[in-house]
A protein has these predicted regions:
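Acetyl-CoA-dependent GNAT
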Residues: 2-8, 12-88, 94-107
């Protein structure tokens, strides 16, 4: 996993992250994903690998981005990358992409 400067960190996405993921997704895409899509990806799709980008702040962590890929026959298909509007233009999407590539190489 990619090492990030504080206050940021990456970790695997969980079902508990879905409400925050949907908020970033809605702010990022004209046709946002559904809750059920992410539930299925995290619980039923053995090919799917998703990560979230978190920022520590007073009062707790804030989910500021997410990304995912499918590993199919030794190749990755990047399914999504999204960063909250307040965090855009600062390399956060690049962190997410690089992390996906590192994870895929490790599988």
């Amino acid at each position: 996993m990619l090492a990030l400067p504080p206050p940021y960190r990456l970790r695997p996405m969980t079902v508990a992250d879905i409400p925050a993921v949907l908020a970033v997704d809605r702010a990022s895409f004209p046709t946002p994903a559904t809750e059920q899509l992410f539930v299925n990806e995290l619980t039923d799709n053995q090919l799917a690998h998703y990560q979230v980008l978190l920022r520590d702040a007073a009062g707790g962590e804030t989910l500021v981005g997410f990304a995912g890929f499918w590993l199919i026959a030794g190749e990755i298909h990047i399914s999504t990358i999204a960063v909250s509007p307040a965090e855009r233009g600062r390399g956060r999407g690049e962190w997410l992409l690089l992390n996906l590539l590192l994870l895929a190489c490790a599988l």
